[in-house]
């Protein structure tokens, strides 16, 4: 009898402890749910190489504490890999052009650089790259200065040569220093393919200011095979920030060299717009890589892209660049309204000219995005 009472007392204490733990868990869940309601989700989308991951890194630098020394050091192998990959692309591209072009001779490497090129191409094809040494830098610089490589570079849009090629080649000595720690500029130029989902929480007016909105920004893989992973992020998103690299109108995809990058961006933009879960979602379109766009327009006709085949040049210099930009902007506006059902026209749609590497411009742009979304929230609450 006493034993039974003792057991009942024990069970009663256990139940009380369990109930207390359950109540605590429920309380914390309720608190977290309330806190989550005040956090606005932003989904950062765009095709591969649109510059969206650079935007993501800028947010970390601008509205958080940036990268600590350990994080910076983690970029060393990434930057070294970028150097080797760029070198391989240029070397292999020159070989291909030398075999297929009428003016093949200008793509032929000098005798002394031929062996160097083969060695560096082999390194660039490995899964694990060696640390960048002074001797390897000497070889890379010799290859980079070869007239055949410089001629190949002029055909970079056909060969998947990254935008950061010049930056890397100009900083080889610094990258190979035994005491090298990447700068924030190095990190911004570093290219690492986004696979899966990464997120960051920030406030454009500073975490300590109570009036500031808090955002959670999600960056997802841009290549085609990554897009199926986006679905679980779609519901309940405050805004989609869509990055379009407007400078890539004459380039093809990394994963499908038959497909024009701008056409892929157009199709992706329209696909996202038509998703039912975005019917009330605000859209912020970043027409990115304007710095490269303004350099390219005078050299490469905009109608090199099928989508822009009706483009007609009207002038030269800055006036022509502005005309070209406004044409591209109008094309995206037309796509937006064609893909937006009549009952969705009240959702916010804004277009921003951006250069992901320009920190001041990115900061200004996100302040404008913040202002737009705050006004939208006030309007929906009936306060405007």
Curated annotation (Swiss-Prot):
Pfam families per UniProt: G-alpha
Region (G4 motif): 284-291
Named cofactor requirement(s): Mg(2+)
GO terms, molecular function: G protein-coupled receptor binding; G-protein beta/gamma-subunit complex binding; GTP binding; GTPase activity; metal ion binding
Boundaries of every G-alpha domain copy: 38-384
Region (G1 motif): 41-54
Residues that, per the record, bind GTP: 49-54, 163, 188, 194, 222, 288-289, 291, 356
Region span, G3 motif: 215-224
Region (Disordered): 1-22
Binding site for Mg(2+): 53, 194
Lipid-modified residues, N-myristoyl glycine kind: 2
Region span, G5 motif: 354-359
Keywords: GTP-binding, Hydrolase, Lipoprotein, Magnesium, Metal-binding, Myristate, Nucleotide-binding, Palmitate, Transducer
GO cellular component: cytoplasm; heterotrimeric G-protein complex
SUPFAM superfamilies tied to this protein: P-loop containing nucleoside triphosphate hydrolases (SSF52540), Transducin (alpha subunit), insertion domain (SSF47895)
Domain commentary: The helical domain (69-189) is required for self-activation.
Function: Guanine nucleotide-binding proteins (G proteins) are involved as modulators or transducers in various transmembrane signaling systems.
Family membership: Belongs to the G-alpha family.
PANTHER family, alphabetized: GTP-BINDING PROTEIN ALPHA SUBUNIT, GUANINE NUCLEOTIDE-BINDING PROTEIN ALPHA-5 SUBUNIT
Annotated protein name in UniProt: Guanine nucleotide-binding protein alpha-1 subunit
